[in-house]
From Swiss-Prot:
Function in brief: The UvrABC repair system catalyzes the recognition and processing of DNA lesions. UvrC both incises the 5' and 3' sides of the lesion. The N-terminal half is responsible for the 3' incision and the C-terminal half is responsible for the 5' incision.
Principal subcellular localisation of the protein: cytoplasm
The keyword Ligase is annotated on this UniProt entry: no
GO cellular component: cytoplasm; excinuclease repair complex
Subunit: Interacts with UvrB in an incision complex.
Domain of life: Bacteria
Name assigned to this protein: UvrABC system protein C
Xref: InterPro entries: GIY-YIG_endonuc (IPR000305), GIY-YIG_endonuc_sf (IPR035901), GIY-YIG_UvrC_Cho (IPR047296), RuvA_2-like (IPR010994), UVR_dom (IPR001943), UVR_dom_sf (IPR036876), UvrABC_protein_C (IPR050066), UvrC (IPR004791)
Signal sequence bounds: none
Length: 595
């Protein structure tokens, strides 16, 4: 059986070298850590190579799987990381858990507006800009703006001048008359800056920096320089979030090799709180598949209709509107279009990864059977059939066969057998009977023969099977045996006239394949034996009671559901199910004596 380490190793090979977030999962598929990276592949690989500190070592020790989301920038990755941490509360993200909401910069709606940092958005109370990745970024931006623009600072208008007036960071509207046009001009410049319309402001700031430098006011020049640098660092386009509170779902899709991946971003309070990726085989045109999908997406009450649904611009808006009863938007530019493009890109990445993993899995399984054939000295075993017996002290003996083609389970070829000619717990004779029955029928029907037969057992099992094949059926098919250790795990494969151990590394793909085959045939046999045991156990109790035929047996099962519940029932309960008094008493007695 392939280990989780092998699965992670394979998955790492298809992670793109792009910015994004990753989610680490434990053995219970619970998200235990969320992180971000400028280059996802490099960061994820670093977790599984080299030495780490104690905390990271503990984290890596619990990782059994991971997911990732591609973004368009590092800033975007950070904001998404915070969203995911708020949503999933991973226990390894201690430092980020306390951040309850994103910070915004707000220009208040007052006669003399103020510039404040807030985490609460109240409609109609002012203009909001953000969200910012963290409080430090927002506070630093406000601090620089305060130094450049003498906005009012006090919450309530005082009756005297404050310190900010004396250091040149406030015009003092509490005492002196202030030109409202000048104040409005400052407000517009700040608004432009916070909206990212920075070309004019950058030009003005660079000019002011030059003037300050020429007048030897280097401190003021440094402040202008810092503000210019801050604009470059913090005023990046952030596609993963929006500053408005509109509830919207954003759809994107990609197609490849007859498959379609539809990606949905759920935007709430301006933040992407969740995404959904669905893979569907293309049965119609891509547009028709999309219309069908989006109609079912909301019609089946799986998702609540948002205020807006954003979709790619080339789709038929009217057709979508006919199946989705909310506002349909097809953004043509700006952040909203960027978000649709990002959904398309994530759908494309999801498809690429899926096909790469499938291709690698195909290559790995084909390589596994080729190597298995080489190490055993036989032709590549394209078709493998494996047998296992199951019984308890010879009671209800059964056998099962599983079929693997090209290293993958062929469940249509699975077979179940009840042992008919063997009395008592005789594994060897049971195996002979089943192999005889299986390949006699195969020969009669002209069905394809396997390239390799595997039995769960050692030399004795192999000898019996070979004898039946060669001396009774005239077949020459390689037969191998699989032995388990004291922990009931596959330990070695036996092959050849002397049933010798075939040298094979335990971490090789052929060995993993043999483990999968042995585990699967054992599971199949055990399940069949359990079903048989339950059925015969039911018959052995109910069939011994006079007055209970097929109809009453069926009615009892429908009423009580199981023998266990019948045992818990009183005579009166049994009678109420439709049995005569004497039959109910006899059944109650039989059930009480059946352990």
């Amino acid at each position: 059986m392939e280990t989780y380490q092998e699965k992670i190793k394979q998955k790492l090979t298809v992670v793109p070298i792009e910015p994004g977030c990753y989610l680490m999962k434990d053995r219970n598929d619970q998200i235990i850590y969320v992180g971000k990276a400028k280059k996802l592949r490099n960061r994820l690989r670093s977790y599984f190579t080299g030495a780490h500190d104690a905390k990271t070592t503990r984290l890596v020790g619990e990782i059994r799987n991971f997911e990732f989301i591609v973004t368009s920038s590092e800033t975007e990755s950070l904001l998404l990381e915070l969203n995911l941490i708020k949503q999933y509360q991973p226990r390894y993200n201690i430092l980020l858990k306390d951040d309850k909401s994103y910070p915004f910069i707000k220009i208040t709606k007052e006669k003399y507006p103020r510039l404040i940092v807030t985490r609460t958005v109240k409609k109609g109370s002012g203009k909001y800009f953000g969200p910012y990745p963290n409080a430090y970024s927002a506070q630093e931006t406000k601090k620089l703006l305060d130094r450049i623009y003498p906005f009012r600072k006090c919450d309530k208008m005082p009756d005297k001048l404050c310190l900010y007036y004396h250091i040149g960071q406030c015009l003092g509207p509490c005492v002196y008359p202030v030109d409202l046009e000048k104040y409005a001009e400052m407000t517009k410049e700040i608004t432009d800056f916070l909206n990212g319309e920075d070309k004019t402001i950058l030009h003005n700031l660079e000019q002011k920096m030059q003037e300050s430098s020429e007048s030897l006011d280097f401190e003021r020049a440094k402040e202008y320089r810092d503000l210019i640098q801050h604009i470059h660092n913090l005023n990046k386009k952030q596609k993963i979030t929006s500053s408005d509170n509109t509830i919207r779902d954003v759809f994107g899709y990609s197609i490849s090799k007859g498959w379609m991946c539809i990606q949905v971003f759920f935007i709430r309070q301006g933040n992407m709180i969740k995404r959904d990726a669905t893979m569907i085989p293309l049965q119609q045109t891509e547009e028709e598949e999309f219309y069908t999908f989006i109609g079912q997406f909301y019609d089946l009450n799986q998702h609540i209709l948002p205020k807006e649904v954003h979709v790619p611009k080339h789709l038929n808006k009217e057709l979508i509107q006919s199946v989705v009863d909310t506002k349909i938007v097809q953004p043509l530019k700006g952040k909203k279009k960027d978000m649709v493009d990002l959904a398309n890109h994530n759908a494309e990445v999801t498809l690429e990864n899926k096909f790469e993993l499938i291709a690698k899995d195909e290559s790995r399984t084909v390589k596994a059977i080729e190597e298995l054939g080489d190490v055993m000295g036989i032709q590549t075993p394209i078709r493998i059939e494996a047998f296992d017996n199951s019984n308890i002290q010879g009671v209800n003996p059964v056998s099962a066969m599983v079929s693997f083609i090209d290293g993958k389970p062929n469940k249509k070829g699975y077979r179940k057998y009840k042992i008919k000619t063997v009395d008592g717990p005789d594994d060897y004779k049971s195996m002979r009977e089943v192999v005889r029955r299986r390949y006699t029928r195969v020969l009669n029907e002209g069905s394809p023969l396997p390239d390799l037969i595997i039995v769960d057992g050692g030399k004795g099992h192999m000898s019996g099977v070979i004898d039946v094949l060669e001396n009774e059926l005239g077949l020459d098919i390689p037969v191998a045996g699989l032995r388990k250790n004291d922990k009931h795990q596959t330990s070695e494969i036996l092959y050849g006239e002397q049933a010798e151990v075939v040298p094979m590394k335990k971490n090789s793909q052929p060995f993993y394949l043999l483990q999968r085959i042995q585990d699967e045939v054992h599971r199949f046999a055990i399940t069949f034996h359990r079903q048989t045991r339950q059925k015969t156990g039911l018959q052995s109790v109910l069939d011994t009671v006079d007055g209970i035929g097929a109809k009453r047996k069926t009615k009892l099962l429908r009423t009580f559901g199981s023998i266990k519940r019948m045992k818990e029932a009183s005579v009166e309960d049994l009678k109420n199910s439709g049995l005569p008094q004497n039959v109910a008493e006899n059944l109650h007695h039989a059930l009480s004596n059946n352990s």
